[in-house]
């Protein structure tokens, strides 16, 4: 009894659910296996005020949907095709139960409850107890629904009973969640790919400022949220984002329209269905808001509600996504066969006919056939059509031609959703076929068991659907992934206005391959696109104008990232594309061009051989080498002349060789620096200069020691010979070699490409490795130069031909000036000028040394040969000896006078302070009558005229002073064939000064030829005072002797010999000889 009651309860519930749909709102046919279907035959329902004062009535569906009816027809066509096919489910018949969802969740749930209730009744096996005459088989799978929001509600209910649901148009990514929607599958791609494709299109057209509108349901919200994520990754900014629905009130619609009208974004992304978007489009059309580009999701990209000719000035040029079109052979003919009298199992045919031909079908002979008893239910609970607008239409004849009317129903050129429906039915049929052909032991269930096709249950079909794999009629592989999604691609369509009938047509302008590599997924044929206003030019939808190549986008504070200012790339960076977000840095050896659009190779700069500056320095260096070689050649050719001998020939040769090295070392600083030139140039320069200065130092110090030595002994001759001189030069140079060796071993210099000095130039320079080592190298050179300068300055009063002191002093001054100036110049320059400064310093110092030390001698050798003689050298030496002796005499005379003054002084005459070079024509001592009166010799008497003394005119007698005057003294000195006479005059009585002549070292005295016979060379004689007219010969002195070449004169100890010069009462005197005149002022200096 309990089971019987339960049977009637469930049967009543099923009957109520079925009766909610009138006979004209169902399509149903018997079969061995029943498939359910949910299709939007209407776009919505009429809103009624449910005050609950009477029994609530089922809502009335309004606004017929021709596309929805075509989708329904696709399901029926697929079932009939399968039933007639011997390959699929032979000996079995598929039936169907199809309901109208009216594009609402409530109507969809009514139909779903009917499926669930009928399945529950069937699962109880109540037929034997209930004796039900009208048994309705279970619905083992449901095809539908359309909208994602509707499918979400249906899937939640069907999933409780594991009834498979295969949707043909619900693309929301939320439905991929298998934890929530266990039995949901679909033959349409996931919206996640569609959102990515939308972002790719916006990026393709270089838009970055868009608005978004989404349906306020499970389709629009997830879709637009995914789009925001993709847009953010591509730096696409969203100006506004609004939610709408077909039930939005007027105020909400007005507010959204105001936002669209005031926005500067011209591209609007819409994730919505046609019914949800329609109210908004109508208001935009009313306000005539044009110039917008609509980016349509698949749900409304081909919606007949929006694609209306009267809306084209607003929605024309829309870019939308369409599912890949499929081919259904025979479907066109099937659509044309629809007729209310022939389609006995399709309760929707009557309304379709009336809506197509705008007429009204009467019941009876002329009307449609009575519905099948299987569809008959409680009419009072069904939808009442008495209030339908069709009641006021003209009567239909039933002879109307469906092919003569243009409706979306007959638009089968691009079968997208219809093909998805077709594919969904075939998917279920192939799952049933797998069950039908299952071999025990290989099945999908426990122990490889198989389901019974005659008693198959919904959950068993779901299991086989998840493992489905078959080939469609188009040759494509059909299989569902773990999320129940079917792989698929999108076609990109563009809304055009047909020139033939003025309708909106959808032209395919590209495609989007979901599974291609990133960057290769999107293809668009720009030439086929027609934009809003029939324009072919891509619209501008950016917050800011494009930043051209050479600039980058700069963020404006407080504005979205898409609102930016164009900032020029800094030097050294470039951008070669429009709207670059950042400038790329040029490689190290490159620099940005003037427009910063690309990088060009940096200019390589170094002190080149071919540039004017390098050529000039090279010419000066070559000139220095040539001059040095010329001087060396002159010295070698005239090596036996007195001047060359007097300058120490061997050291001079070595000095000239070092100068050649100095000039040559400057060439290592010119040309592109290489590692080997960098390692060689500083040591070559340092060692060459140290060798040069060492030669000058040893040479100058040797002459100084010889002339200042009181007794030149064999010790001097031994230790100041050539061996010691070269040893000292080597030791001084060896120290520099050690410094260079340590430098090259610890931190060797190397070539270096300097990018930091100037942006557009690479300076190839030498990195010195260690500035400290360079400092030691130059410092040691300067130390030797300072010592050399000290000795040169100390020997500045030596005989002119030995002395090179004046010129050495000048050369050292030049050397110090050059290198002192070099330090700040070196520190303040960079690049190739560093090498140039050092080359200039090397050349200047080298030329200074060469000119000061050698040019004067070369000039005498070549142009003044008369001065390059033994006599000239000896006279110069004699002048130096006289000068030293006279200075000593004057100094001692002053000391004696100071002592006499301290004892009371004398009554002599005032000393004369004038010294002149004149002949003594008056005898200053009249009281003494000389035996012979002679005229004094001229003060500057050359060796030649010294042999032929001029006769002296008689002196004029002068009155004798009362006091006794000292005698006048005249001394003669013989040098070989020359005679030098000097005179001393005394005017201070009773004063005696004694001076000893310093020992001298006469070298390089050549024998003079006299009648082809060698004359003996005689040394300097000691000076003695005698009578006025006395003449001392060399024989009387006993000190004469030959002096050979490079032979040193041995002198007695001055303390044991007679005074060299005795001057009595000395105050005023003149010493002349050898072309020189020594005065009192000179002796006092």
Curated annotation (Swiss-Prot):
The modification Phosphoserine is found at residues 893, 900, 921, 1068. PROSITE patterns: G_PROTEIN_RECEP_F3_1 (PS00979), G_PROTEIN_RECEP_F3_2 (PS00980), G_PROTEIN_RECEP_F3_3 (PS00981), G_PROTEIN_RECEP_F3_4 (PS50259). Phosphate binds at residues 67-71, 416-418. Residues 791-806 are annotated as: Intracellular loop 3 (ICL3). It comes from Bos taurus. Disulfide bonds join 61-102, 237-562, 359-396, 438-450, 543-563, 547-566, 569-583, 586-599. Residues 543-613 are annotated as: Cysteine-rich (CR). The chain crosses the membrane at residues 612-637, 650-669, 676-699, 724-746, 771-790, 807-829, 834-855. This is Extracellular calcium-sensing receptor. Residues 881-901 are annotated as: Interaction with RNF19A. The gene is CASR.
